């Protein structure tokens, strides 16, 4: 909102936004697109304005994930224990600076994340170009980071003759070793050892399936299993905050006011579940909870939907608002006041919940060294894709995708699973088909490589560990970014496992895979 207000010259308090249900936007609404244009037109014409983009405009007028060149080196002892990481990375952020500083920082926060690496020297540089403008996109900064470190650890494991799953497991975060995140502080919880324990039999079963398929193949189609580990933080860097209201109505229902932005991820269910878990103490049923959402006139500021912050930040705000209301309703004998009793006793019927991560102020991120403790909590995911590679055409198919994740207490399993199904399919597109380099070509959904339904594996297997997060509402972390932080290097690693050809650039379209296969013949 401040960007829009500044851009069209309107005081922030005079700007009202009412969000329509938008479906999946995956972060690009962090940057104003058509809203500011509409605002300028309204000011000039002094009448309601509608702006509809055609497909070409929708693709070219909106931001894209910033491409990056990741140059990563890893060192390990003779047993495979990681000792050091060195990096020199460059990000093409297009012509505008917005969020460029944050993107640069993300590469330092997530490159090598998930592993106990005591010595890290990782320099990242963001440059301006006349290419597509860079904006926020799901798992901001981590897909670039893990293209570096998750392929590098695979290369190192192969050189040392160590199974890539074993290499990752032996180096994961361990409380007994006091391992830290790349920014120098311990994670909120140590859950990776248990995550690898859950994933181990799934990985062994996948290796067996792949071996059986290769044994039965004539060699034209080769099969492989890949692995990667992704970690992503929940929240905006440093101190973050969100607010919500809970109001008891005359008919005994409760209205929740929340600006928990809905971008297809299920914000309405998030508000409902986060508030009902507390409101049910007063006998309030889910159908008695009304939602007023995403109108800046009636809802308090909840912050943006991004960085998987909403479940943690807005979920806590809804929880606190509900707790404050329930506390006011509760009588000394343990029963609860009605609306009429509240009014008769002069008690307020509307309460605010304000959640602030003040603890993040204790160790703010140093802009020069990237050291600090920026996030309330983290999400952890192990990716295990199984691929088939046609060695004559270079076509890669993801036949099965197994995913093992820990996103804390699961508040609504259907929504979490939906986030993971969608994110993994986006990862398939990122790894194999999607590109946006040629503005004379990549300006239709077909030409920019959006995957078809047939490109998505029918067999997606999800497993969740639920390690309680002390800073999350009822122990929950976020989940939105988790499935898209590192599925693509796992797919590229699976191509290597199948063929011995190492792909280090996305998308791994058939011509790129064929070129890598021909290199093996030299």
Language model region names:
Residues 1-8, 105, 225-260, 265:
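Conserved beta-alpha junction segments in alpha/beta enzyme cores
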Residues 83, 255, 396-399:
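Generic structural signal for well-ordered beta-strand positions
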């Amino acid at each position: 909102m401040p960007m829009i207000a500044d851009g069209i010259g309107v005081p922030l308090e005079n700007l009202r936004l009412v969000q329509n249900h938008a479906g999946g936007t995956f972060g690009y609404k962090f940057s104003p697109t058509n809203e500011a244009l509409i605002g300028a037109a309204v000011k000039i014409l002094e009448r309601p304005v509608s702006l509809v983009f055609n497909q070409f405009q929708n693709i070219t007028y909106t931001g894209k994930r910033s491409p990056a060149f990741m140059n990563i080196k890893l060192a390990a002892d003779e047993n495979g224990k990681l000792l050091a990481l060195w990096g020199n990375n460059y990000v093409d952020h297009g012509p505008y600076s917005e969020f460029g500083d944050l993107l640069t920082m993300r590469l330092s926060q997530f490159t090598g994340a998930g592993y106990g690496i005591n010595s890290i020297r990782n320099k990242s540089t963001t440059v301006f170009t006349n290419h597509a403008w860079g904006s926020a996109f799901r798992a901001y900064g981590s897909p670039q980071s893990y293209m570096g470190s998750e392929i590098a650890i695979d290369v190192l494991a192969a050189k040392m003759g160590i199974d890539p799953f074993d290499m990752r497991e032996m180096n994961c975060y361990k409380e007994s070793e006091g391992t830290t995140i790349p920014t120098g502080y311990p994670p909120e919880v140590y859950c990776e050892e248990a995550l690898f324990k859950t994933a181990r039999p799934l990985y062994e079963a996948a290796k067996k399936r792949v071996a059986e398929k290769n044994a039965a193949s004539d060699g034209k189609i080769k099969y492989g299993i890949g692995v990667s580990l992704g970690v992503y933080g929940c929240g905006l860097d440093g101190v973050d905050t969100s607010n919500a209201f809970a109001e008891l109505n005359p008919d005994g229902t409760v209205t929740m006011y929340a600006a928990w932005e809905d971008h297809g991820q299920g914000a309405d269910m998030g508000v409902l579940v986060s508030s009902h878990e507390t409101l049910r103490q007063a006998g309030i049923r889910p159908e008695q909870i009304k939602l007023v959402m995403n109108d800046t006139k009636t809802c308090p500021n909840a912050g943006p939907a991004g960085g998987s912050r909403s479940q943690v930040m807005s979920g806590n705000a809804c929880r606190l608002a509900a707790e404050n209301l329930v506390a006011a309703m509760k009588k000394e004998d343990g029963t609860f006041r009605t609306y009429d009793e509240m009014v008769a006793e002069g008690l307020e019927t509307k309460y605010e919940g304000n959640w602030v991560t003040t603890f993040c102020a204790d160790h703010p991120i140093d802009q020069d060294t990237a050291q600090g403790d920026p996030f309330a909590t983290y999400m952890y995911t192990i990716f295990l894709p199984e691929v088939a590679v046609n060695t004559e055409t270079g076509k890669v198919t993801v036949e099965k995708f197994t995913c093992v994740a820990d996103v804390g207490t699961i508040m609504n399993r259907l929504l979490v699973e939906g986030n993971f199904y969608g994110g993994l399919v986006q990862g398939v597109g990122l790894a194999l088909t999607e590109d946006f380099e040629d503005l004379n070509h990549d300006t239709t959904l077909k030409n920019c490589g959006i995957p078809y339904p047939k490109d998505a594996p029918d067999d997606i297997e999800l497993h969740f560990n639920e390690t309680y997060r002390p800073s999350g509402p009822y122990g929950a972390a976020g989940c939105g970014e988790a499935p898209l932080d590192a599925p693509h290097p796992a797919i590229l690693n699976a191509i290597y496992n199948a063929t011995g050809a190492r792909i280090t650039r996305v998308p791994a379209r058939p011509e790129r895979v064929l070129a890598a296969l021909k290199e093996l013949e030299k």
